[in-house]
């Protein structure tokens, strides 16, 4: 199965007709996690930048090991392809699909790929906020970013989606930005481990929000900033949140502290 967007197909010297065409692409390697059976490349077509994620069979041994550890194995590009489409339906800014393909039905041996347009003139929130502790941004600018991240997270969780790697480095802010709400464009990336279902279990909401909290700890956020996030995420007054969500808040704190001790795993 091969799908190409018309724009991407028109830019190719010859259209891709099989998975081998994607695996033959040469480009700048961005990621190649050891033992993960996937790699990410950046390449250009007609002067436009694209990212290509290649997946190949992880083998039944690896699949069973993950399942026995109560972890869902990433066995192909289909998950990211579906996640990008779903986020688009929900109005959550993310990557733009250019191509997708899959070869074979056996999850232990199949090969697949997904191509997305490069998000040009963007910076990760991790880099954008790196000096906030020493050089705080304008109050309104910070509040808008916090509210946007909280609203995006709320929309995911209320629609049966959890990210599993929800760190501020996976939010890309379009540049330049003048601090206004109407010009704020924040894209969520790295969706290959996203889970899609009817309802997100509490433990996965805790993991997402705890991961966000951990990754923002060094940005100089104040107690009021955290309260702002909670108000938008829960869509409730603070009094109600503290009365009804105490267990959730303690679990989020525990998750964040655990990550602080051991660091972010390279999944």
Predicted region positions:
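Conserved ATP-binding subdomain of kinase catalytic cores across diverse folds
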Residues: 15-126, 136-137, 154, 158-159, ...
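Short, mixed charged/polar active-site loops
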Residues: 47-49, 183-186
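Short, solvent-exposed loop/turn segments that connect beta-strands within catalytic domains
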Residues: 105-110, 176-185
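Activation segment of protein kinase catalytic domains, centered on the conserved DFG
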Residues: 132-144
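C-terminal structural cap/anchor segments
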Residues: 142-147, 153, 164, 169
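Hydrophobic residue at the +6 position relative to the catalytic HRD Asp in the kinase catalytic loop
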Residues: 166, 170-178
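C-lobe/activation-segment region of protein kinase-like
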Residues: 184-257
């Amino acid at each position: 199965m091969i799908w190409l967007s018309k724009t991407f197909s028109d830019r190719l010297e010859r259209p891709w007709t099989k998975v081998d065409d994607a695996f033959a692409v040469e480009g700048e390697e961005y990621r190649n996690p050891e033992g993960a059976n996937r790699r990410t490349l950046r390449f250009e077509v007609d002067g436009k930048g694209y990212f290509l994620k290649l997946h190949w069979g992880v083998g039944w041994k690896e699949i069973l090991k993950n399942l026995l550890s109560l972890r869902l194995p990433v066995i192909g590009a289909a998950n990211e392809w579906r996640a990008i489409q779903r986020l688009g339906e929900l109005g959550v800014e993310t990557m733009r699909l250019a191509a997708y393909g899959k070869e074979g039905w056996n999850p232990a041996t199949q090969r697949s790929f997904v191509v997305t347009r490069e998000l040009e003139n963007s910076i990760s929130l991790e880099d954008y906020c790196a000096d906030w502790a020493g050089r705080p941004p304008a109050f309104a600018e910070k509040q808008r970013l916090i509210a946007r991240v909280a609203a995006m997270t709320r929309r995911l969780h209320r629609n049966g989606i959890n990210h599993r790697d929800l760190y501020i480095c996976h939010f890309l802010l379009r540049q330049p930005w003048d601090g206004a709400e109407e010009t704020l464009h924040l894209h969520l990336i790295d969706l290959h481990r996203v889970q899609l279902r009817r309802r997100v279990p509490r433990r996965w909401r805790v993991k997402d929000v705890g991961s966000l909290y951990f990754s923002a700890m060094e940005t100089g956020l104040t107690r009021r900033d955290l309260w702002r996030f909670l108000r938008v995420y829960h869509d409730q007054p603070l009094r109600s949140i503290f009365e009804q969500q105490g267990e959730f808040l303690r679990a989020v704190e525990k998750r964040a502290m655990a990550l602080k001790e051991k660091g972010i795993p390279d999944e």
